[in-house]
């Protein structure tokens, strides 16, 4: 239901689906955690993202999304990092951060609404508390990066302004 909802949301909001290649000739954003393989005498890599293709498609179509597999050869000591996963990557030409957050809220709300409407039985089988999901409504609370740094530092974490939050 989640995958169906993602596709339905983007299709009903005039996003164009463009699948990106799974084999690519280079890394995305300068990273080096790639799965490489011989590809007719050259090295090809399993794609980490369809972002490069998505950005070009967004400039052509205005709104675009890619939904496909991603591969990352990251060595991790946690179970939170997968080497293979599926990722949805929407791109909107000339979209600012506030519009981006609005689209994210709309997407998450749409998915939750459909899952709660069509998959309540499955949520109960998985022993999920649907009351928490029902409370997840828009607008979502928002804070600035600076406010977040202050909250983290006030709660005993040490993080400098400009640092990544990490995972």
Where are these regions (language model features)?
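His/Asp/Glu-rich mid-to-C-terminal helical/loop segments that flank catalytic regions of hydrolases
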Residues: 61, 88, 96-117
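Generic alpha-helical structural element
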Residues: 93-101, 137-141
């Amino acid at each position: 239901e989640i995958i169906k909802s993602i596709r339905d949301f983007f299709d009903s909001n005039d996003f164009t689906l463009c699948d990106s290649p799974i084999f690519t000739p280079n890394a995305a954003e300068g990273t080096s955690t790639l799965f490489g393989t011989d590809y007719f005498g050259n090295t090809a890599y399993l794609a980490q993202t369809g972002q490069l293709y998505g950005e070009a498609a967004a400039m052509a179509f205005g709104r675009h999304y890619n939904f496909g597999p991603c591969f990352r050869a990251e060595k991790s000591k946690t179970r939170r990092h997968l080497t293979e996963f599926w990722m949805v990557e929407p791109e909107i030409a000339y979209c600012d951060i506030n519009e981006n957050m609005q689209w994210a809220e709309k997407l998450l709300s749409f998915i939750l609404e459909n899952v709660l409407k069509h998959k309540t039985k499955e949520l109960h089988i998985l022993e999920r508390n649907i009351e928490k999901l029902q409370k997840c409504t828009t607008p979502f609370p928002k804070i600035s990066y600076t406010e977040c740094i202050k909250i983290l530092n006030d709660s005993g974490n040490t993080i400098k302004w400009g640092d990544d939050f990490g995972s």
